[in-house]
Amino acid sequence: MGKAMLKLCITLMVLVFSGTAESKGVMRREDESFPHLKSRLCGGLNGLGEDAYRSHCVVYYTKRMGVVSLDHVEELANHCLRIVKQCCAEGAADDCLQTELAAVQEQVCTRMSEAKDVPLVGRCCALAGSERHDCFHHAGGVAEGEGAWPHALPVTSPPEYDSVTVCALHATANARLYDTLLWEFSRRYPSASDSHLIALANEFITGLTTCCLVEEEHGACLATLREDFKHKLTEASHKSQNLCKALKSLGKEKFEDRIIVRFTQRAPQAPFELIQKLAHRFEVLAEKCCELGHSDRCLVEERYTVDDELCLEQSFVATCPRLSSCCSLSGSSRAQCLETVPVLETSDKASPATPTLPISEQCTLWAGKPVEFHKRVVWQISHRYPTTGVAQVEALAHHYLEHLTICCASEDKDTCIATEVAEFKSEVEKVHTKSDWWCRMSDLLGTDRFNLLLIVTYSQRVPQATFEQVEEISHHFALITRKCCSHRKNGSCFLEERYALHDAICRDEAWLSGLAEVSRCCAMDGRARILCFDELSSHLNASVEERPELCSTSLCSKYHDLGFEFKQRVAYGFGQRFPKAAMGQMRDLISKYLAMVQRCCDAMSDFKMDVEEVELRAHRLCLDAHQLGEEKLADRIMIGLAQRISVASFVNISSVALHFAQSVIKCCDADHEKTCFMEQEFALEDQVCSDSEALSHIPSVSRCCELHPFDRSVCFHSLRSTQASTLASTHVAVGKDDSLPGHVEECQAFASGNHSLTDQVMFEFARRHPRASVSQVESLARLYSELARACCALTDADQESCLHTARSQARQEALKSLQRSERICNTLSAIGKEKFEDRIVIALSQKATDASFEQILEIANRMSRGLARCCEQGNNVGCLMDHRHALHEAICSTPDGSLPQSVAACCNTSNTSTTTSTTTSTTTSTTTSTTTSTTSTTTAAEIRDSCFDNLQANVSRAHAPFYSNSQLCLMKLRTPHRFLERFLWEFGRRHPQAALSQVEELAEMYVKMTDSCCGKLHSKSCFTEQRHTIHMEIRHAYAEVQHICGSLHSRGEETFIQREVTLLSQKAPNASFEKVSQLARHFLSLAKKCCAPDHAAGCFLEEPYAIHDEVCRDDEVVDQVGGLATCCRMSGTSRAKCLAQLPRDLGRHGNRETPEFDELKICELRRDNPAVLMEKILYEFGRRHSDSAVSEVKNFAQKFSHSVTECCTSEKTHECFVEKRAAIEKVIKDEEAKGNLTCQRLKAQGVEHFEQLVILNFARAAKSLPMEKVVEFAHRFTRIAGQCCEHDTHCLIDESFHLHAEMCGDHGYIMAHPGVANCCKSDVSEQGTCFKIHEDVHHAEEILSKDVSPAHPTAERVCLRYRQFPEKFINLALFELVHRLPLLESSVLRRKALAYTGFTDDCCRAVDKTACFTEKLEAIKSS
């Protein structure tokens, strides 16, 4: 069977399809000799490599025998590869192929019955003897009348697998999956070039890799991938159909001329003879494909076919090393490589654009071989200008040959041709000038504005075109311009937009089939085609409206929904309306029109929002009326009045408030609620101005009442802003104030149950804080009233001092609110409303994870407007708008029915009754100090706030959102103003525990990815690479979380706090110890919440970001540390860099290495509170070594702590401290010297080399660690070392300390190795010995279990990993080798690992991969 299959394979290699461009080294061409066949086959094998060659075999056999199963095709392909290797091996007989071919024909027809269904095979097998031999050897493809590939399947994308099946197949049988894709694509498109089919399979499996290994939303990703491929295949089919129409309309000669231009531009290094031969082959292939009658399956693309043919010309490829390396690739990888091969000529030594032969020889060739000479002229111009359009090359060639004809008939040929060449050069210079202009405009205007310019230009030139056609052509020309302008340095940019426009039109199926006149013009070339299109444009002007659409609701809907496309459509419409207008004038008109639309739509949007807000406020007012009752509603109205008219008395204000409350209740009666359009602010003003007895007699109020309603509102606003108290005078509201009764009157009022005192307190707070929310004023007043009520329960002697304390406490709460408000307003002022609203979007998304994007935007906009109003005064006078409180207010102000389920329950708490629990304890004391009662009152607002704080986030979503590349580019184009916000929402709801700045950074990374990749020539690879980077960033963050939680679980809270104290003291060395300790405990509470089982899935708490957020939230720290306020206005990496560059002011602390303590105090602290002592020591060491590793700082802190213990119990305390300090300073200097050596090694070796050696050291020191952990720990250490080494001094880094710290921070590792837990609890200096003992025990257990080293992964698995992430493969090699050869030096192991990575590429191409790996591994072991 084996021999038969061998012969069968050889036979099929020369079977059919001879004379075509499908010659990837796997078939024989017509009349081709066996020596030449062997040369081609062996050249293809050597050029492609075994893996790619086998892929071509799979494609070839599937195309020829599509009815055969995949198993049979794979068997044929494997035999094919083995035979070619056998016959191409050194020492193989010259007649190897011929000998095999002579004996296989009978085997094909007798052993492969299913192949007879293929028409050509069946026809040959029906013959006998020499006729059969001739049929197999000389058949020229599908016979006439037999039809094209009857076994071909319908045109669709590959079969639809469910995500679980295809991802499992991808993980376990990647090679089989790849063969399946090749088989499926080849059955559906048997006319496509091998390279094209391989490119499709490669792209599809790359997409599968992304969906299965990177993206977590597998189903959505695969569905999008299939849709993209359906579109891609349809587009490729349309290109082929257009090619067929071009061939039919132009004729063979002109078509071949155009192919010469394309092929020359594709391979400018190739000689004319080779280009001509390739162009002819492509013309034959295209003609054959287009005559088959199956154009929907005819995938013939120029670039893949020319690449196939070019790479088979080994004699030429061998002269170009870069070209040779490209040809070793396949599919789109090879296409991309060839596109980046540099043109050989430079501007100084560029080839001429006209033939260099003497005039006599030119005339002879032109007269004797006009067709060939015409092609040579076309080649010469294309060779010189590889970026120009086909039509322009044809026009220049026609121009030159016309004048050559005249010169050849002239008596003085030399003078004539010299004149012609000069004129030709002048013509070329004109085009160069135009090209430079387009390049300058492209650079000057940028992508979007340049696109608008093109749309205007093309809509003027072709007014009968649809918007979609103009937009597509503009995009095409923009890509050409970008490519052309990148070649300006070598003088090859040769671009004129008219020719590019007409080339694009003539390639467009819709144009060719839609207008007969267009087809007629496209059949012409050069200037004739230009004139034809000019005439066409002048006779076919589109009928358009005289004026563009003015402001309307429909126009604003388009403006908001279409985004940038709206601008494109405006440019298109203006170009149609004014085809003769100057471009500068058009730009001015379009700019003015767009500005008008923006103003109009902004005004309409503001008005609509104002109306909605009034309706919403009226609705909320009615809800308050129904739920609170008249008295409580009057209290709230009183607060609003006091804020607006701070000059009025309490009596007047309360009277008007009560009257207005009655009006509201009447307005909100059940029969009128839907029509009650009452906004409290304006209605109150009406009430005030109509009440002549209460307030209107006040001069300032009377003056406001005389104004127009809008001006009146402004006037009342100015009243409250000018009368408001400043931050410094806030204490008046709760301090000694004539408007407040004395303590006797207060207590009498409380005893009688009179609520007027509480109302009076609310009034005083309201008039001093005119921009505070009503609930905040109520909260402050309630706090004071409850404290005062508790004071009144004391004896008369203690009441006054107690009330004074109560007022001070209320004053402090007010001051805190003012400070928070001031911080909010300062932040808003510093980062702007847009950036501030972005942060609100994140906070809302994290709170309401099931809310839609539109809901989040609406709430965020309302909240940002409210905060902006609160902060509209420059000095933020009286603004008590707490961000947390305002956030919840904004969420709950959403109309009923549209609230997300997750937050509806919290908002409904405001409808419940107030829960009050009061515990009163009275203590009478004869001293002046009095312990007041403890009163706890939980209001509805506080219940709501608590509910929001404890919301259980829905974290079942993937870590990163999935949008296809095309979706991202379309979203960026259509809604650029909402693009960033969408990803803030996406990342916020996926990571509800993440630091705000971390969410910002991830969203910005997505935006930058889209900006940089959309419209690029290699956008797919750009997206793939950057998506991987983002996913790795997320995985790294989750690894950080696991490390934090592992550290918390394994070491306990006390040790965790010590670690945070160290980190915080390093991040903010100028902050006080008390503040650092407080922040460390706050971060512990965050970590405990984050590391709880119900939050672990959504926990995205990366330490540096969280620490930065906490530091920046603390007003005291921000005030203490110079420059911190500026940094805190930034976010993400920008803020981290800013904080890293803050100056460390440690000069006043004396010795940099070792902190100095008061010996008496430190011994007292050790006795009374040893935990705080350790924190203080860590704080002092941390701030002195702000760039060092935490484990290093902790090591010396522990040494110092032991010294304190020893010295405090010594009789000679002072002498002991002096001695111990000196010893520790010496050790620190020694460690710094080691750190300097590490930094020198890092600088000399480079980051990559350094990290590889760290991987080896970690894997050798901790054989119990899996590879992923070793790589993760080594990467983190390299990053820390890099940061530490940026500063020349005081760098403490040690690999062993870092490794042990990482192992102790990995909860999963500790659970798997319980013995490590004891090591982690010991002192840092003692951990090394403990870990060594553990590793020795682990190694002994492995020996007993006869599993000394991990088994080598299967060859297929190694190759899968290598193909997917080749840049990370070196890590696997390092890890494997250090476990197998542990006694070798790290530098030697690294060299072997690099060698291993090098031969992996070869072994993964080999047929017997396992044997190849075995042989190579044995070789490097013995080397």
Swiss-Prot record:
Main localization, broad class: secreted
Compartments, record wording: Secreted
Chain ranges of the Albumin domain: 29-230, 231-426, 427-608, 609-811, 812-1031, 1032-1226, 1227-1422
Glycan-linked positions: 490, 541, 652, 754, 908, 911, 954, 1070, 1236
Sequence repeat ranges per the UniProt record: 913-916, 917-920, 921-924, 925-928, 929-932, 933-935, 936-939
Gene3D superfamilies: 1.10.246.10
Signal sequence interval, chain numbering: 1-23
MF annotations from Gene Ontology: lipid binding; metal ion binding
Residues that bind Cu cation: 36
Keywords: Cleavage on pair of basic residues, Copper, Disulfide bond, Glycoprotein, Lipid-binding, Metal-binding, Repeat, Secreted, Signal
SMART domains to which the protein is assigned, alphabetical: ALBUMIN
Region span, Disordered: 910-936
Pfam families linked to this entry: Serum_albumin
Propeptide feature ranges: 24-29
InterPro entries: ALB/AFP/VDB, Serum_albumin-like, Serum_albumin_CS, Serum_albumin_N
Stated family: Belongs to the ALB/AFP/VDB family.
Function, as annotated: Serum albumin, the main protein of plasma, has a good binding capacity for water, Ca(2+), Na(+), K(+), fatty acids, hormones, bilirubin and drugs. Its main function is the regulation of the colloidal osmotic pressure of blood.
Note: In the sea lamprey, there are two forms of albumin, AS and SDS-1.
Protein name: Serum albumin SDS-1
